[in-house]
From Swiss-Prot:
Name this polypeptide is given: Small ribosomal subunit protein uS14A
Keywords: Ribonucleoprotein, Ribosomal protein, RNA-binding, rRNA-binding
A cellular-component GO term for this protein: small ribosomal subunit
Species for this entry: Mycolicibacterium smegmatis (strain ATCC 700084 / mc(2)155) (Mycobacterium smegmatis)
Subunit structure: Part of the 30S ribosomal subunit. Contacts proteins S3 and S10.
Protein encoded by which gene: rpsN
UniProt function note: Binds 16S rRNA, required for the assembly of 30S particles and may also be responsible for determining the conformation of the 16S rRNA at the A site.
Pfam families assigned to the protein according to its UniProt record, in alphabetical order: Ribosomal_S14
Length: 101
């Protein structure tokens, strides 16, 4: 079980990422646009750097939705490998069976 503070901090980051996503995408478009002037590009870089650090999607951590475990995360289920195994053994994941060949 992850610390509650880490789980809450990650959720706050998710909210920040959503709040600034459009602004961040607009600035990145300006920076990448070959038709934009060097002054406009420099202004966009400066504005992008002024945005909060936690508004960058790179800083998000995929966590288990049940207990917040940060490692061994399986995107397909949104769970950690440990939780997937437990739930699969109990038959709580539809369509998941033990491998047999």
């Amino acid at each position: 079980m992850a610390k509650k503070s880490k789980i809450v901090k990650n959720e706050q980051r998710r909210e920040l990422v959503q709040r600034y996503a459009e602004r961040r995408a607009e600035l990145k478009r300006t920076i990448r646009d070959p038709a934009s002037s060097p002054e406009r590009r420099a202004a966009a870089v400066s504005a992008l750097q002024r945005l909060p650090r936690d508004s960058s999607p790179v800083r998000l951590r995929n966590r288990d939705v049940v207990d917040g475990r940060p490692r061994g995360h399986l995107r397909k289920f949104g769970l950690s490998r440990v939780r997937v195994r437990e739930m699969a053994h109990r038959g709580e994941l539809p369509g998941v069976r033990k491998a047999s060949w």
